[in-house]
């Protein structure tokens, strides 16, 4: 073999050995850069989990493997210590670590029984009893509505576990016929039950990840299937988190628009001013006025409102209403005359119906 070909072969061999040692590229699997934040990682997992779930891809023989790779990538990159190990030593450095079930990871985002694709509610068999649904108000800030977030909720969930002994189950009403004599019968209704293994309810700690999507609206619900009240003879109900947006001290939400008030001095109102408003994510919205600003004047800043829930690329407006702070001290006669001379404005005392716009 020629020296040049031998050199190329060795380099290729080293590359292959390195790839095997390095293991899977978890960042590539999740489709995020190595600098990705935990929020980016969670968002990527949630999106891909819906796409790659084996139930959604029954004709793909690699669906299970892809889903397992996705779960492994999330488990490592969502844990700061495991991520540090992975960044330093690759997947080989994690071999001795504990690995979670990928189904457990999935249930943290969607609940115990997965989800119904296409957004349809799960179908309930009328013959199978079902526990009650639980609705929990989840308070979110306007900052979270603007930028999105993942909220971790820890709850103690009652879970049915096997216990010693037997119990009555599947009880139902049945008609019994008793012969009292020739041509005489008596019909009675009795409760008939089957005998089932005994169960007891045990509280187990569950951690759920609720994604607060940008632009989420008050009253929207995020369902977690099978996370509601248990039923010893059937299926548990669902848990639904209902969004409740808390009031903000600076901004008021109306649809996708944000409203706020700015108070300026009388001098600023007359001669103009410049200022910055700190937005919900910390960026500055610059305001520059070189005209007279009247009390109640409004300024529209397009694209500085909240993202639209259905299309985050569309944002509402920021509507700023100006208030003018007049001097609280009385003016001297000399100051009054000076203002009259400066403004050169005579009396304007017009009485009209302001509510009708006349």
From Swiss-Prot:
- Keyword check for Disulfide bond, yes or no: yes
Q: Where in the cell is it found?
A: Endoplasmic reticulum lumen
Signal sequence: where?
1-22
- Principal subcellular localisation of the protein: endoplasmic reticulum
| Record's keyword terms, sorted | Chaperone, Disulfide bond, Endoplasmic reticulum, Glycoprotein, Phosphoprotein, Signal
Source domain of life: Eukaryota
CDD domains recorded: DnaJ (cd06257), DnaJ_C (cd10747)
Protein name (record): DnaJ homolog subfamily B member 11
Primary role: As a co-chaperone for HSPA5 it is required for proper folding, trafficking or degradation of proteins. Binds directly to both unfolded proteins that are substrates for ERAD and nascent unfolded peptide chains, but dissociates from the HSPA5-unfolded protein complex before folding is completed. May help recruiting HSPA5 and other chaperones to the substrate. Stimulates HSPA5 ATPase activity. It is necessary for maturation and correct trafficking of PKD1.
Q: Which GO terms describe its molecular function?
A: misfolded protein binding; signaling receptor binding; unfolded protein binding
Q: Which SUPFAM superfamilies match?
A: Chaperone J-domain, HSP40/DnaJ peptide-binding domain
Q: Name one Pfam family in it.
A: DnaJ_C
Q: Which positions fall inside the J domain?
A: 25-90
The UniProt subunit note reads as follows:
Part of a large chaperone multiprotein complex comprising DNAJB11, HSP90B1, HSPA5, HYOU, PDIA2, PDIA4, PDIA6, PPIB, SDF2L1, UGGT1 and very small amounts of ERP29, but not, or at very low levels, CALR nor CANX. Binds to denatured substrates in an ATP-independent manner. Interacts via the J domain with HSPA5 in an ATP-dependent manner.
Q: What does UniProt say on post-translational modification here? A: Contains high-mannose Endo H-sensitive carbohydrates.
Report the PANTHER family cross-referenced here: DNAJ HOMOLOG SUBFAMILY B MEMBER 11
GO BP terms in the entry: mRNA modification; negative regulation of neurogenesis; protein folding; protein maturation
Q: Which GO terms describe its cellular component?
A: cytoplasm; endoplasmic reticulum; endoplasmic reticulum chaperone complex; endoplasmic reticulum lumen; extracellular space; nucleus; protein folding chaperone complex
What are the annotated glycosylation sites?
A: 261
Q: Which PROSITE patterns match?
A: DNAJ_1, DNAJ_2
